[in-house]
């Protein structure tokens, strides 16, 4: 049965969903990496697809920008469509000189300046963390392909155009591996509804140096991240 934001039928989604922010990246992932692909939803042009990867049923759907948007889609997928695992595959900015543009980072946790998890957790701080086995599977998948990844804390920002750029120095000091806008929200939703989640990001720009990729590159060239996510699903099944 369709929800207010996802016009799919029950059973349309696999138990694992890859979620990029950009719905056109969802389309790219489905058309590039999956077989027997069927588009299952398109409300607000937030496209969702289901297909198979090496015989394994997997879905992919966009989640938009920011914690409020991704939380809506993650909640409905888990609560209404029975999704068990969400893997966000997105872009992030780097603040550390040892992390370069196009590096892949795995978010084992996510700090945030958003209050959504405090609202969810009765005013207390909630440690927004990824599922350990999903983190391990992603790291193992990367090693199997010879892809170097950085594993650490992300920072999920409430604002893209921040009025406090000095915060980037604080993030660097605390070892933040990437700045994005969704992981903490997705981890909170997963915890609330008893699901599992992971965020894998490709560094699209470096906040300190100004180096950046184009919007077209962000949409269609971050293939290492996609392959790590897909392979990690198969490794998770094998446990």
Swiss-Prot record:
Pfam family, one: PNP_UDP_1
Binding positions (phosphate): 21, 25, 44, 88-91
UniProt binding sites for a purine D-ribonucleoside: 5, 180-182, 204-205
GO cellular component annotations of the record: cytosol
Keywords: Glycosyltransferase, Transferase
Site (Important for catalytic activity) residue list: 218
SUPFAM superfamilies referenced in this protein's UniProt entry, alphabetically: Purine and uridine phosphorylases
Classification via InterPro entries: DeoD-type, Nucleoside_phosphorylase_CS, Nucleoside_phosphorylase_d, Nucleoside_phosphorylase_sf
Reactions catalysed, as given in the entry: a purine D-ribonucleoside + phosphate = a purine nucleobase + alpha-D-ribose 1-phosphate; a purine 2'-deoxy-D-ribonucleoside + phosphate = a purine nucleobase + 2-deoxy-alpha-D-ribose 1-phosphate
EC number: 2.4.2.1
Positions of transmembrane segments: none
Keyword Membrane: no
Enzyme class per UniProt: transferase
Family the UniProt entry places it in: Belongs to the PNP/UDP phosphorylase family.
Function: Catalyzes the reversible phosphorolytic breakdown of the N-glycosidic bond in the beta-(deoxy)ribonucleoside molecules, with the formation of the corresponding free purine bases and pentose-1-phosphate.
Name used for this protein in its record: Purine nucleoside phosphorylase DeoD-type 1
Protein source organism: Vibrio parahaemolyticus serotype O3:K6 (strain RIMD 2210633)
Lineage of producing organism: Bacteria, Pseudomonadati, Pseudomonadota, Gammaproteobacteria, Vibrionales
């Amino acid at each position: 049965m369709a929800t207010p934001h996802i016009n799919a039928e029950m059973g349309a989604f696999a138990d694992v969903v890859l979620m990029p922010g950009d719905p056109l990246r969802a389309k790219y992932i489905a058309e590039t990496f999956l077989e027997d692909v069927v588009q299952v939803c398109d409300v607000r042009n937030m496209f969702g697809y289901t297909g198979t990867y090496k015989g394994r049923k997997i879905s992919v759907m966009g989640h938009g920008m920011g914690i409020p948007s991704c939380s809506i889609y993650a909640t409905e997928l888990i609560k209404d469509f029975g999704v068990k695992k969400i893997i966000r595959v997105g872009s992030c900015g780097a603040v550390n000189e040892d992390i370069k543009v196009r590096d892949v980072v795995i978010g084992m946790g996510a700090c945030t300046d958003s209050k959504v998890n405090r609202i969810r957790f009765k005013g207390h701080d909630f440690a927004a963390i990824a599922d350990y086995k999903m983190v391990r599977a992603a790291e193992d998948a990367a090693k199997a392909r010879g892809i170097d990844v950085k594993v650490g804390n992300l920072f999920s920002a409430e604002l893209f155009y921040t009025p406090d750029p000095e915060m980037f120095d604080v993030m660097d000091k605390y070892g933040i591996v990437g700045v994005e806008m969704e992981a903490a929200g997705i981890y909170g939703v997963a915890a609330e509804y008893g699901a599992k989640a992971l965020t894998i990001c490709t560094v699209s720009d470096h906040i300190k140096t100004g180096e950046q990729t184009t919007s077209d590159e962000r949409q269609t060239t971050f293939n290492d991240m996609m392959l790590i996510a897909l392979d990690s699903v198969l490794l998770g099944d094998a446990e």
